[in-house]
Amino acid sequence: MRVWWRDLTDLVLPAECAGCGAPRTVLCPRCRAALCGRVPRRVRPVPEPAGLPVVHAAAPYAQEVRTLLLAHKERGALALTGELGNALAAAVRAGLGGGGADAGAGGFGTVLLVPVPSARWAVRARGHDPVRRMALAAAGELRRTGTPARVAAVLRQRRPVADQAGLDARGRLANLAGALEVTTGGGRLLGAGHVVLVDDLITTGASLAEAARAVRDVAEERSGVRTTVYGAVTREGRDEQRIGARTEREKWVHGAPEKASSNALGHALRAAVIAAPQDSFEMNRN
């Protein structure tokens, strides 16, 4: 009922920009440009958790974009879903286009957007599942622009987890380790297309790494291919001790995780988010 009422009021009541408060518009041109006006980039946390797939982000998590994501997630600004879905779709396209010889929508068949699941208590408190909602909008935008796509909401939490807010990178990894699983029958669905994990935001990468682990595990069980992801596949230099994310400046080798996803799924696992920390987009502008 709450979600239905919010949808109705979004259509009937006078709107203001959810990013800056400008009157008579759900999203003003300036805030739309902040959300969708950049070329999506590859980003990665520092330090990088083992097993994290290649991640592309559409926008920096700063100012207007932060406000928009929080308005949609926490305040039920559902009228933003379409624009947020467009931004997520752009990040998905960037990841598919960077896949090498099989890059491009035509080489992938159907794209399966797999949302990182929210905790059940969070969905109840918010009255909706924001990431799944944005994934559905992104799939619609991809189809509209010629890429076959659909949402495969096959991940669920297998145990309760603490609120990630306030936890550092190690704490988030420990909190989420082994927390996700693929639903019964979900493995069969994952074999029907090119899997792209989707979330609203990347900070430490713990959520996406755990989602990737769950997807790889079920894919390997179905294919009979088993590989081990070692913590040593992460890389952290002396000048990279803080937690953040940045665009890729050199080719890094992902051994076990990338080979596992490629062998078992038949393609390299990818991930896309709407936003990543600001420095991800400032450290590499070429």
Predicted regions and their residues:
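Glycine-rich phosphate/pyrophosphate-handling loop used in enzymes and phosphotransfer proteins
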Residues: 1-286
